[in-house]
Amino acid sequence: MQGRGAAEGYHRAGFEVVGVDIVPQPNYPFEFVCMDAIEYLRTHDLSEFDAIHASPPCQAHTKAQALSKGRNNGKYGFHEDFIPQTREILLKIGKPFIIENVDGAPLENPIALYGSQFKNLYTQRKRLFESNIELKTPSTPMVQKKTPTAGNGFGEDGFIAICGSGGVRGMNSRQIPLYWGFALGGIDWMTRAELAEAIPPAYTEFLGKQLIDYIKEQRNNG
């Protein structure tokens, strides 16, 4: 129930990861089930899982709508908001969960994570995370970085905007995915399109360790 970058972060935190997506993911590095994630949650025995991460499609909420409209004569299309039904199902299941989405998504009491709060990340990539357990944010505060808009090269301290499929000033087509992967924290197994949507593994490694601490505490108290 989570994306490729998110999965790597949870793996680093100590989880055994199973990914579920309705779209085939040939580059996914862990066990994978090709199926609608919501249907999977509704119909499968989840007793073997200790926690669930969900990344519902972000197209209904992303600020990249403006970029897409500009390239498609003002057209963007309809995109359903899957967050409410995802939350409803996860609350019924009752296991610790995290729902991730973009800035502007209707998450309830989310925390926000930024690239500048972590070492060795060179993109801000703000993401929101909702949970049914208390999540802490990093002790390092977010630092504003002067980052050019998508396609316009490097900004302060090498920070770059990672999105879209157009050219990037200062890089050729082979260099773009290499630097994007580097900027996201060392991702070297994704395509450019996958990198454009990836969560930095550092985010979910940070959150995954909190999930593991919570799970251990519940077991000790049980």
Please state what every model-predicted region is.
Residues 1-8:
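Glycine-rich SAM-binding Motif I of class I
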Residues 21, 31-34, 40-52, 58-218:
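Class I S-adenosyl-L-methionine
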Residues 22-26:
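Helix N-cap at the beta1-alpha1 junction of Rossmann-like dinucleotide-binding domains, i.e.
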Residues 15-21:
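Conserved SAM-binding motif I beta-strand of class I
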